[in-house]
């Protein structure tokens, strides 16, 4: 899949499926609305209209189903007819699965995605997840030919006209962002260390005409970034704080996306075991998603100030490693007693959000991280967990997840009951909870929030993506689509405006609305 290029076109044109294999994909009632005249040129002379109709009549999705139309050159596949209220109407996860299993082989292939206009964005991002970029299989190096998959959307429902050129460009940039994030997460630490992650940031900056701000190694210590420095100081490649900033004329507010970029997490001296350490190359998933989303957002035009803050470190073991009982002074000015070196992500993010607040003057701070294993227990493998000081933004995150396919579900936000878990006798707080049975994912997020203050008047959103950052052995690029959708109202792109949840009806208590009115407006 690493040599596969995705192309989004308004019309993929006609071709014999034996020369260009084809997958037609959609919900069954949508597939029945596709006229034979539209698919005839892509299926003839191998498939007749009678065979096409017969294939549709045999499909019985439970939750999905597929039927070959001509050998292994043409297939029609059906998505679930219904989804539950906590799933995406696009059935995005099933799109990825069906493309992986049903798309015929070949150097030049075609996917016809049948859906309604509101599901186009989520469907495209789901398609992208089926084509990872990273591989080191020895056979792959011998297969140098570039393969292409052409994607055509056939729209049904109210807005059933052709897909606009601006939409196709947005889909290309969004899916490039998803695949970029997945590639970074899939790449092992012997290649994707803090130095090479900075190269990725510099590459995106050069493409966008932005010079990144980089603070690293001993300068972090000198300037008071005790969280990032303390986590990464034992590694061969030094830790860093990097920032990409987009500051357009006419901006009315400042947004900061803060990503956890632990390129590898051994656990430090509180070392992980042989079964829990493999896969910890994925601990940079938050920073990877922020990078992919920032690139796409700026390419599509972003009207407000947007800062992407990357907290990069390798949590390693060595003579200079942080020890349990050490006390670090963080950028917020607060001291932290280390009682678990494997609770490192919150330390680097605490510095990151504090920098966003103090130095960048952010009105809205969103941090994204593969923060806790407990997230998978709290909200599962498919839904990220959201923790926020705003009921309105909590509802917006959930709705954005359903619109883009990166699903989200809330955690309990109750600092007055939970923050005492970090009580320390010798410092302002410890870095790990006393009771691991007391909502540990919520507590981990609250640790981060405490470094900007629970009374901070701005909007703070924490997204824990530990479980959905991967599906099996492969990264998903989770978070890119979510950020683009959540902040779509600030985009100049009409498709991102469409998938933005803002302005939607939200189910919040009256008291929550009153508190939210004192916070910053939604973008």
Curated annotation (Swiss-Prot):
SUPFAM superfamilies: Zn-dependent exopeptidases. Its EC number is 3.4.11.-. InterPro entries: Leucine_aapep/pepB (IPR011356), NPEPL1_N (IPR041417), Peptidase_M17_C (IPR000819). GO terms for cellular component: cytoplasm. Transmembrane segments: none annotated. Zn(2+) 2 binds at residues 260, 265, 283, 344. GO terms for biological process: proteolysis. Keywords: Aminopeptidase, Hydrolase, Manganese, Metal-binding, Protease, Zinc. Its cofactor is Zn(2+); Mn(2+). Zn(2+) 1 binds at residues 265, 342, 344. One of its GO terms (molecular function) is manganese ion binding. The active site is at 272, 346. Disulfide bonds: none annotated. Belongs to the peptidase M17 family. Probably catalyzes the removal of unsubstituted N-terminal amino acids from various peptides. This is Probable aminopeptidase NPEPL1. It comes from Pongo abelii.
């Amino acid at each position: 899949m690493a040599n596969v290029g995705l192309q989004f076109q308004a019309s993929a044109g006609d071709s014999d499926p034996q020369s260009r294999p084809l997958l037609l994909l959609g919900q069954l009632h949508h597939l029945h609305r596709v006229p034979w005249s539209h698919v005839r040129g892509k299926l003839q002379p191998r498939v007749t209209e009678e065979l096409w109709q017969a294939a549709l009549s045999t499909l019985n999705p439970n939750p999905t189903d597929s039927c070959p139309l001509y050998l292994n050159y043409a297939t029609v596949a059906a998505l679930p007819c219904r989804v539950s209220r906590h799933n995406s109407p696009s059935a995005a996860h099933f799109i990825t699965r069906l493309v992986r299993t049903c798309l015929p082989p070949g150097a030049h292939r075609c996917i016809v995605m049948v859906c309604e206009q509101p599901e186009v964005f989520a469907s495209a991002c789901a398609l992208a997840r089926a084509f990872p970029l990273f591989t080191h299989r020895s056979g792959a190096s011998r297969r140098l030919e570039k393969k292409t998959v052409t994607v055509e959307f056939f729209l049904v429902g109210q807005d059933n006209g052709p897909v606009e050129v601006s939409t196709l460009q947005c889909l290309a940039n969004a899916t490039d962002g998803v695949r970029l994030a997945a590639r970074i997460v899939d790449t092992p630490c012997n290649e994707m260390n803090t130095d090479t992650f900075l190269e990725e940031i510099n590459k995106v900056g050069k493409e966008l005409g932005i010079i990144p701000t980089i603070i690293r190694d001993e300068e972090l210590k000198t300037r008071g970034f005790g969280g990032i420095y303390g986590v990464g100081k034992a590694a061969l490649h030094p830790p860093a704080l990097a920032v990409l900033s987009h500051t357009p004329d006419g901006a009315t507010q400042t947004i900061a996306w803060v990503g956890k970029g632990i390129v590898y997490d051994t656990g430090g001296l509180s070392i992980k075991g042989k079964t829990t350490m493999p896969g910890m190359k994925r601990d940079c998933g938050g920073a990877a998603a922020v990078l992919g989303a920032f690139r796409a957002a700026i390419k599509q035009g972003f009207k407000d100030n947007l800062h992407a803050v990357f907290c990069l470190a390798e949590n390693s073991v060595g003579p200079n490693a942080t020890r349990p009982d050490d006390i670090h002074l963080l950028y917020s000015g607060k001291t932290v007693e280390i009682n678990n070196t494997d609770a490192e992500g919150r330390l680097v993010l605490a510095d990151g959000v504090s920098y966003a607040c103090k130095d960048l003057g952010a009105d809205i701070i969103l941090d994204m991280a593969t923060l806790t294993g407990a997230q998978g227990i709290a909200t599962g493998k498919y839904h990220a967990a959201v923790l926020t000081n705003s009921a309105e933004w909590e509802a917006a995150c959930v709705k954005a997840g359903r619109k883009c396919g990166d699903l989200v579900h809330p955690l309990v936000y109750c600092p007055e009951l939970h923050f005492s878990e970090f009580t320390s006798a010798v410092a302002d707080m410890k870095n790990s909870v006393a009771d691991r049975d007391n909502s540990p994912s919520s507590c981990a997020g609250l640790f981060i929030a405490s470094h900007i203050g629970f009374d901070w008047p701005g909007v703070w959103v924490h997204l824990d993506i530990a479980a959905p950052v991967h599906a099996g052995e492969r990264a998903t690029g989770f978070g890119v689509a979510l950020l683009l959708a959540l902040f779509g109202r600030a985009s100049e792109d009409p498709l991102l405006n469409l998938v933005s949840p803002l302005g939607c009806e939200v189910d919040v208590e009256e008291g929550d609305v009153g508190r939210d009115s004192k916070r910053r407006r939604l973008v």
